[in-house]
A protein has these predicted regions:
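Catalytic lumenal/periplasmic loop and adjoining terminal transmembrane helix
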Residues: 35-42, 243-253, 279, 289, ...
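Short acidic/glycine- and proline-prone juxtamembrane loop motifs at membrane-interface regions
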Residues: 44-46, 72, 143-157
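Membrane-interface transmembrane helices that cradle and orient dolichyl/undecaprenyl
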Residues: 4-12, 123-125, 129, 164-180, ...
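Hydrophobic/aromatic-rich transmembrane helices and adjacent perimembrane loops
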Residues: 147-148, 154, 190-194, 199, ...
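Hydrophobic, aromatic-rich transmembrane alpha-helices
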Residues: 116-118, 298, 305, 331, ...
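Short helix- or helix-capping micro-motifs
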Residues: 27-30, 134-142, 166, 187-191
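Signature aromatic-anchored transmembrane alpha helix within multi-pass, membrane-resident enzymes
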Residues: 3, 24-27, 202-206, 228-237, ...
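Membrane-interface helix-loop-helix junctions at transmembrane boundaries of multi-pass membrane enzymes
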Residues: 15-18, 175-176, 212-229, 352-376, ...
Length: 565
């Protein structure tokens, strides 16, 4: 008896094999970039120190107390805590080693897995070519690749957000209640990672209502209402317990400030207080990144010609340069546009806008494509508000916009190249294939992408290692930069009574960075050298070690405490 195979089964098998090969290539690419950057990280980001401490507190304290006292949302620290279980068994070592490795692995793994929903989202929006190249380019562009390797919450946030968008797109096409409920659950999880995750649910709700008002006018409201109810209920079910525990929408300083009407105050009005010191008299290294808002949580130098603060990670408010409301608005628009351009590697935003215009007819149906556009617009509005209130815009906050925009950019390039090559113009012989253009963009971006993370902070790492070998638990560390105190082991001190009373405190160690561009925008500036010397302080370590102390970039002073001079 002859067995005749079903052609549709062969076609389905071929499609899945092709998808599998493309996904394998994406996973290998993402893994290679993550591993390279993890192996070439001098220090973790300052925000990651807070996340590591957060995860450590979840392990050692009551969760309700920890959630209320920390400013960041808990899902990424919970992911770090979960990752620390196998890391502790495999790697071992101190809490510093375990938690830092766990934070880097949690962030890196989420960044790798991101290629899967990105591929399928692009496949749903256009085709698998668009999904493949959008995911590949996003992994290779400097801002996204480096943030996803830096032990920050963005990787987990982007992974969950992309899954939510994929579920929303499919739910709009099928009308499935399960899809909207799943999207709501993912929106709640995205909110538990970063507060702007709630915008996903808002974008889906706007698209649902818009479709009823402008497309399906004859459709009864009951179906739309049930889909909205499923979306909102799922979001509330996931996000509600955290909101109830903290008794508010968010503990983040910036998020709370966004709900107020005041424009940001000058940085000169923000001074350090005794809150930056812990019970041992040393700098609380997990506080500075969060307690007074992100305006002071990064470093940078000023372009004196324009009076605008610039750093590797953000654009800062120009103190004293703009005072009126129109000035605030224009500066905020400039800052947002600059960070978006940087996120798109300065060129990819152009085909993204072309793609939006070319495929604008799709938006008339108020479907999944509209969800993506509304989400990007809502994120832009939120970042404008951040710029107006907090006085800064960070590149990592525009990543969800870059992620969504790359689909339109890739689709536009395919459309333009195919149209040119099919035309009768002589230019078609000079027009390269779209894949070659994408490869050229990747090759240009990779050198910047693969630069070591925070290589300019090697000195702080060295100071921290020196402190770890020479200080006693009772000695104080005054470190406005966080890294030296972190690598000295002060991040994970157990706050037990009498823990530091077994030995007598002798010195207050003060980290002083001699580079002016590395001292700007910190919560508490380094004490002037003259004051340290007058207090009896002496330089006990300098970096680089091979140069004379007068030529050193970083000085470590040991100042005798009262009664020990």
């Amino acid at each position: 008896m002859t067995c005749i195979s079903n052609p549709s089964e062969k076609l389905s098998s071929s499609v899945w094999k092709t998808n599998g090969v493309l996904l394998l290539v994406l996973l290998i690419l993402a893994t290679a970039i993550r591993v390279w950057l993890l192996c070439h990280t001098e220090v973790t980001s300052r925000d990651s120190i807070g996340f590591e401490r957060y995860a450590w507190e979840l392990e050692h304290k009551k969760w309700k107390q920890v959630l209320r006292s920390n400013l960041h949302h808990p899902l990424y620290p919970l992911t770090v805590l979960a990752m620390s279980v196998p890391v502790r068994q495999i790697v071992g070592g101190s809490d510093l080693v375990v938690m830092q490795a766990s934070a880097q692995l949690a962030s890196g793994l989420a960044g790798i897995l991101l290629v899967i929903p990105m591929f399928f989202l692009g496949k749903e929006l256009f085709d698998r070519r668009v999904g493949f190249w959008a995911a590949a380019i996003f992994q290779c562009l400097p801002v996204g690749a480096r943030v996803m390797s830096d032990a920050l919450s963005e990787s987990v946030f982007l992974l969950i957000s992309t899954i939510a968008l994929l579920l929303a797109l499919r739910a709009f096409r099928t009308g499935s209640m399960t899809g909207f409920v799943g999207c709501g659950c993912c929106a709640g999880l995205a909110y538990l990672t970063r507060p702007e995750g709630i915008l996903i649910a808002v974008a889906v709700a706007v698209a649902l209502v818009g479709r009823r008002l402008f497309v399906q006018r004859q459709k009864v409201w009951t179906e739309i209402a049930s889909q909205l109810a499923g979306l909102i209920a799922a979001t509330a079910l996931v996000a509600g317990p955290y909101i109830a525990i903290i008794q508010g929408f968010s503990n983040k300083t910036t998020t709370r400030d966004l709900l107020k009407s005041e424009i940001r105050q000058s940085r000169s009005e923000l001074t350090a207080t005794d809150e930056t010191r812990n019970k041992h008299g040393s700098l609380s290294v997990f506080v500075p990144c969060f307690i007074r808002g992100p305006m002071l949580s990064a470093f940078g130098f000023r372009l004196s010609d324009f009076g605008i603060g610039i750093s590797n990670f953000a654009i800062w408010w120009p103190d004293g340069k703009v005072s009126d409301l129109p000035g605030h608005l224009w500066w905020s628009l400039y800052a947002l546009a600059s960070e978006l351009s940087k996120g798109f590697f300065y060129v990819a935003w152009i085909p993204a806008l072309i793609g939006l215009f070319t495929y604008r007819a799709r938006l008339r149906f108020w479907s999944g494509e509209m969800v993506l556009l509304v989400l990007c617009l809502l994120q832009c509005l939120a970042l404008l508000r951040v710029a107006m209130v907090a006085g800064y815009v960070a590149d990592r906050h525009v990543l969800i916009i870059v992620l969504g925009g790359l689909y339109w950019a890739v689709a536009a390039v395919f459309f333009l190249v195919e149209r040119i090559r099919k035309g009768a113009s002589w230019f078609r012989t000079l027009c390269p294939r779209a894949a070659l253009l994408f490869l050229a963009l990747v090759l240009v971006a990779l050198p910047k992408t693969l630069e070591p993370l925070h290589a300019n902070r090697a000195g702080h790492h060295a100071v921290g290692l020196w402190l770890a070998e020479h200080i006693t638990p009772a000695d104080e560390i005054d470190d406005p930069f966080c890294w030296a105190a972190h690598y000295a082991g002060r991040t994970f001190l157990r706050e037990t009574p009498g823990a530091s009373l077994s030995c007598t405190p002798c010195f207050r160690y003060v980290v002083h960075d001699c580079r002016p561009d590395h001292r700007d925008r910190f919560r508490k500036p380094s004490a002037p050298i003259g004051n340290l010397v007058a207090a009896g302080g002496q330089v006990v370590y300098h970096w680089p070690e091979e140069v004379h102390v007068e030529e050193a970039n970083i000085l470590l002073f040991a100042v005798p405490l009262t009664g020990n001079k």
